[in-house]
Amino acid sequence: MKGTGAGAAQQIFPLMRDTGRAIMLTRGNNTHSGNLALRDPIDRDVFHITASGSQVGALIPSDVVPVRFSRVSWGDGRASTESTIHRKILAIPGAEASIHAHYLSAISVSFDAKEAENFLLYEGDVQGTEEFSFVPIDRTGAWVLGRVPSGTYREPVGSKEMEARIPRYLADSPATLVKGHGPFVRGGSLQECLHLLGIVEASAALLQAARLRGVDTTALARRIRAAGQAAFYPMKVRAFDAAAFGTYDTRDEGTIRAFRERALFNFVQGISPYATGSMSEKITEHEMLYCPTASAPEGFEIAIRRLPIDALEGDDWELVFHKTLYRDTNHKACIITQSPLASAEGLAVLAERYGMDALVRPGSVALDYADSHDHPVVKPIDAEAVYLNPRVGLCRWDAPVAAVLDMLRWHKGACLIAGVGSIGAGKVTLEQAAHHVSSGESIARFRQAVHLTHVLRGGPPLSHYEPATQ
């Protein structure tokens, strides 16, 4: 197609290929599902979209076709069956890219009914079809996504109804769910869309896990929506900024490789969505190397910045925590991740011990973190985790930093923050910190499986498997 330019095409295909592969690696699509779309940076009347029947996780150059906004072009014949939906999404001001994927937890929570409200909040009928809101109950999802419209469609694949409703939802929200079909997101770049998709899936996985563990997630979602995310989760989440990545204040290849390996592992394993969380290493008495993400797929840049340990005006919550850790303890490395299952397990344990008011009305239920023996913990039940650490420290999202530091001291560098994620600290290396956040997700998964077996099949309760520690 004239006007797109060879240079633009050379940039577009690798980015779409890497994005599609990243989604596939995190089980966001089957072999032939989903679609990606991106505005041409030169010819603004053109967008590029994956072809119908292409393998989004293994794209080849001919799988990406150009389509015009203004008129029918040769690309329309090969483009995804949902190309008209993407055409309208990309007409939204500021929308340079859009993605539709089939993430498992996001689709699973969309199977809800107004009589149940197990995962979603019922909003009413739209032309005879039910409409819901997916309200994330975790800090990252609440800040980044807010309310995610979730619609029921008579024809939920490539229909005129979808063409009319999805762009309308995305004009006000970065993401929307199609019942039984999956999320659509829009953003300023494919990188931002991947970031948003990951948060949708992580927040859905957390919501589902917490609900199945007995947490009244509906009450929690209503409370967050009523109070607003800033009041409920005062630790603001930094907005996605592509300019934050690609800067390296070290030339040491071993250091760069270590940070990249941790980011790739966390991404592929679902420990943290792309461009969430953070990592650092203390390198001198007064300085650290700081990476503003704990997660990135192959082909996507991270960043490593050399920063002073002293707090500076404008530091966000995570950066302040890294700096405080190095000033007040002898740890040398730290990783903070969104850890959806661990975060959900933290919510469940707090609800079991203190009641739902501890989550819905945290100001009315004070938690005591001062006693090194009697404070909130999550007890692993799998052999390896018990061997490593028979108790993992647990804090609510409003715990003072000093309490979190105590948990890391008392529990070998491991702490879960209910509604927020996981923190791992290493005495010497980043790998030690990585072990803790990786183990946190496994600990939660095993506990949740045993709980479901107990509830559904009469198996032994969690207490039967928990280590007898004080």
Please describe what each predicted stretch is.
Residues M1-Q470:
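Glycine-rich flexible loops
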